C-alpha cells in the first residue's frame, strides 16, 4: 500500500515562543518609578483623578505600579492608566486625560517637556547607564574632533545620571570646555536631586536645547540615548560635530540623516496648490495659535489649505484626502514630525519650518533644519505684480504658469457678474481660480458628470428597455436560455 500524500503545507511564519517576563520586585518598582516621591507629591496636593501615562516599554509594569500606589496614596484618589497615547509618547496625552476628566497627568519615561494645557508631573525613572563604557566608546570621536567645546545632552529619562556623566567627561578630557543641559522646570519633575536641576554658570550648565551661549560650529554635541529622526537631523545641521551613545546597546551610534531629501520636499511644497495642515499634537499650548498662523501664511502665498486632526497619522488615514498635494505637520519637535517611513506616504510630508521656507517669494536655504516652531518665519510678503509670473519647479523640471489662487483679470462686465465661470479651462469663483477645479480636471475619473465644460459629449437618449421574465431572450443569431 502506497503512502498517503502529505496535504499540509509549511507555515508561512515561524512559530515564536512566547516571551516570559520575570515579575519585577517591589523594591525595583519603587526605585525605578520613584513611587515614594510620587506618593508624597500626590498626598500633599488636592488632585483626585490621576492619569498615569506609561511608554510602550513600561506598560507591562503599569498594573503593578497602580497596585503599589493604591497602598500608599489617599483612598479618595482615583488612578487611571493611559496605555496607548493619542500622539507622540514623549508628549503629555491631554486628549486621553480629558476623556477620564483627570486633574493631573503623571508622565513616565522620556518627555519633550513642551508647555502643556493641564497640570503634569514628569517621572524620568532611573534607567541604569555604565558611564565608564560611555566614555570609552566616545573617546576616539572626542579626540578627533576639532571643536574646543563639548555640549552634553541626553534623553530626559537619563537626566538623573547627568551629573555623573558630566563629571566623568570633564575628568577624561580636561582640555575641552564641557557644558551640559539641565531641566528648566524642576518643580514638575520627580527623582532629580538639586544638583541635577540647579543651573550654575561657573559649571557651565545650560538650559535644555537652548544653546545660544555657545558657537554651534565650534561645539561638538554628545547625546546620550536614541534621538528621534527630527532631533538628529536638527543637531547634525546645527553643531560642528555630533556623537551619540546608546546606553541600551552600549555602543556609539551615528543616526542617518537625509538633509537633501528635505530640500526636495521643500521644493515640492513650494509648487503645491493645496496644503494639508496636519495637527499632530493637541497638548501643546500654542497649537491653536500656530494653526491660525499657518492658515494665514498659506492664504497670503496664494495657496489653498485644509486643517486635519486624525489622531496618530498613518499612511491609510492620509491617503483618503486626494486633493492634498503636500502635508505640513505641526507637532512636537522631537516626536511629532513625521520623518520615519515617510516614503510610504502617497503625498510628501514637510515640517512647519520647511513650509515656512517654501512659502517665501524667494527661496533661501541656509542648510539648517529647525524643530522649534517659534523660530519659523511665517510672514509672507507677496508682490502682486509677480503673481502671474511662471516659476520653475526643480522637482518636475517644468514651469508652473501661475499661482494656484491667483485672481483672473478680464474686462467683460457681464462675465464679471457671474459667480462661477470657466476661463481658459480653469474654473473660477468670483474671478479666483480654484484648486478644487484644477484637481478635478486632472483626475481620470471625474464622476458621472457635472454642469461645467462645453467639451463634454451629449448623453445617450433614453429608450424603453426590454420587459417581462428574463429567460428565452436572443442576442444576435444565438438563442440564450
From Swiss-Prot:
In UniProt terms, what function does this protein have? Required for the first step of diphthamide biosynthesis, a post-translational modification of histidine which occurs in elongation factor 2. DPH1 and DPH2 transfer a 3-amino-3-carboxypropyl (ACP) group from S-adenosyl-L-methionine (SAM) to a histidine residue, the reaction is assisted by a reduction system comprising DPH3 and a NADH-dependent reductase, predominantly CBR1. Facilitates the reduction of the catalytic iron-sulfur cluster found in the DPH1 subunit.
- Coiled-coil spans are none
InterPro entries per UniProt: DHP2 (IPR010014), DPH1/DPH2 (IPR016435), DPH1/DPH2_1 (IPR042263), DPH1/DPH2_3 (IPR042265)
Enumerate the residue ranges of region (Disordered). 449-481
Name of the protein in its database record: 2-(3-amino-3-carboxypropyl)histidine synthase subunit 2
How this chain assembles, per its entry, is: Component of the 2-(3-amino-3-carboxypropyl)histidine synthase complex composed of DPH1, DPH2, DPH3 and a NADH-dependent reductase, predominantly CBR1.
What does the cofactor field's note say? Binds 1 [4Fe-4S] cluster per subunit. The cluster facilitates the reduction of the catalytic iron-sulfur cluster in the DPH1 subunit.
Annotated metabolic or biological route of this protein: Protein modification; peptidyl-diphthamide biosynthesis
A single GO BP: protein histidyl modification to diphthamide
> Matching Pfam families, A to Z?
Diphthamide_syn
**Entry GO terms, CC:** 2-(3-amino-3-carboxypropyl)histidine synthase complex; cytoplasm
Origin organism of this chain?
Yarrowia lipolytica (strain CLIB 122 / E 150) (Yeast)
**Protein keywords:** Cytoplasm, Iron, Iron-sulfur, Metal-binding
Predominant location of this chain? cytoplasm
The organism's superkingdom is given as Eukaryota
